[in-house]
Each structure stands twice: as C-alpha cells, then as structure tokens.
Amino acid sequence: TGIENYTADCLELPEPENLHDLASARTLSIRQCIGQFFSAFPMEKIVEGLALVEIKAPLNLNAEARLLLVWIESALNDCSDRVECSELKTEFICEKIDQGAAPCISFTYDCESFVECSLDLQGGVAQISARIGGDTHSMTAAIRLLEPQEALAEALFFG
C-alpha cells in the first residue's frame, strides 16, 4: 500500500488474515521504540485520560503512518482491556505534512500528561519526550525503515 492509493483491508480475499502489508513491516524499529518506551509505565498511566493519538507524516510515508497508527490503537486497546474500569475513548488521527518534514507522533491526554515523539528517519533517530504520572521522561533511540527484503522477511516470519 506504500505505492497504491487504497488500503489493503479493502481487498476482498478468501483469507484476509494471510495478507501482510510490507508498509507495516517497514516500521519495525519505530514500533520497537514506542513499545520499549511505554513498557516502563503501568498500563493505567498509559491509557487513563488519553484523548488523542495523532501521527503526522509526509505523503510518501502515508501507508507506514496509517498502519503504525493501527498498531498503536491495537496496543492501547489491549492495555485498556487489562485495566479495570477503563474504556479507551481516544481519537486516532493520521495527518499529512509537507514532503521532507520529519514524521511525529503525539499522545494528548485530558490531564497534564503528554507524549511527543519525533521520528528523524534521515538521521535515524527517534526522540521521545513525555510527562506521565506527573514525572518528566525522555528517550532517544535508533530507528530506520526496513529495506524491502528485510520487510518481506519480517512479514513472512513474524506477520
């Protein structure tokens, strides 16, 4: 879907669960970075009061951004399901930005908490800054989009 103007989920297939979009596989290091960051916090602190998750990315990364947002939504729903009396009432938005601009992800809460993640794919660095549970946190991690052959291997072996 990185080349086409439609999403893979609109295809009618006899076994749609066997379709793996390589645009999703390409985001492996970004997903690992986000997961590693959030793994340091109790699930309650991650989902309570989360109002909006927004990914901004240039058009050439639209497929990756859209599928990354789907992955984030799924992970947050899993967290919410494990937290007592917590129903996730979060809006998820994917917005296009100027070509050449660095993608970013924002987690906006209805309290003082926030998470901002800048994805410098040219420089290979993700920078996360956050306030969760009243404390300030930051993390820097190496990121990159997988090459086509790596994305194919990721999709085939780990789907």
Please name every model-derived segment.
Residues 59-159:
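C-terminal, charge/polar-rich interaction regions
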Residues 23-85:
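ATP/pyrophosphate-binding catalytic subdomain of soluble kinases
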